[in-house]
Amino acid sequence: MILPGGFLLLVLLAAASTSQIVWAAEKSAKLATVRIGYVSRSILDMPYIIARDRGFFREEGLEPELIFMKAAQTIPAMLAGGIDFGSATGTGIAAAVSGVDVRLIFALTDRPSFDLIAVPSITSVQQLRGKKLGTSGVGSLAEILARQILIANKIPLEQVTFLPFGTSDVTYVALKAGTIDATMLQIPQKFFAVDEGFRNLASGADVYRAVMGGLTTTKNTINDRPELVSKTIRATMRAVRLVKNDKNYVLGFMKGPHLDLSGERARFAERVYDATMQLYLSSHTVDETLQREMIAIASQRVKPAQPVPPERVFDFSFVQKVTATLR
């Protein structure tokens, strides 16, 4: 039977459409889910969002799920299998030093962007005696930095009340509400605070070098799913490369909904970008000297029974392998 030309065309179009749907479904079914718990709406977690939006994860065969959570929640979530990776590096290092079987596998920066910001009436670190200081959580990088600043200024830690609030945007709200007297704020919140009249008392980078921003995961994930680790790192590194090489794209991204840049995104975007370029590492690893320094600082609080070697906390082997193949 000979079909009319118009009807035949409709049949062919329907068949082609069906084939495309089936092909797309099969492709989607082949993607492996990767769940990343990220802890800030800042430049430290920007690469994961860019990697998702630009399709870098999907090009690695991964379907990303980015889950916003508190720093203290990342380790329990990883151990329970709720997420594969966490971006709270300070929390991850403290957990590893305490004996939890996790590793830091990717470093975004090696200098903290946190500054100690206080209410306008406090003009020096010495005036924090008897005051309330908000941090993101017990053992977090923000808390470690705050403690190091107090120690450097010879203030006994017991003379300051530490209150865990969660992410920087939450502690910033608490600072503005007068619930706390000071807190550690990172980019971009520290820019907002200073512009609004709050005091910048000290820089975390002046007292402490540390990995800030990056990825942690469990030893089981490293052993059982090495391809997932490599692909996640490769997608992230591609996003970092894009950030460094395409300023116009990143400025547009910063003016979108993903970063916490208050209501004046256009005014802050370029300022934040310039600060980002000064912080992002090229190697995404840190040397053994810094690794041991970070372990020593974490050990002051965690107090492990035995000395902790760097390989018990850090594993940059995947970054090194990906770097060798990424062009």
What kind of feature is each model-predicted range?
Residues 25-177, 181-187, 200-204, 209:
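Short, glycine-/small- and polar/acidic-enriched structural segments
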Residues 50-51, 114-123, 212-228, 279-282:
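A bilobed periplasmic-binding-protein/Venus flytrap-type ligand-binding module shared by bacterial periplasmic
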Residues 45, 75, 79, 143, ...:
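Extracytoplasmic/secreted envelope proteins and their assembly/folding machinery
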Residues 4-18:
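Bacterial N-terminal signal peptides
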Residues 295-327:
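Conserved C-terminal helix/tail region of periplasmic/extracytoplasmic solute-binding proteins
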Residues 91, 169-260:
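Pocket-lining segment of extracytoplasmic ligand-binding domains
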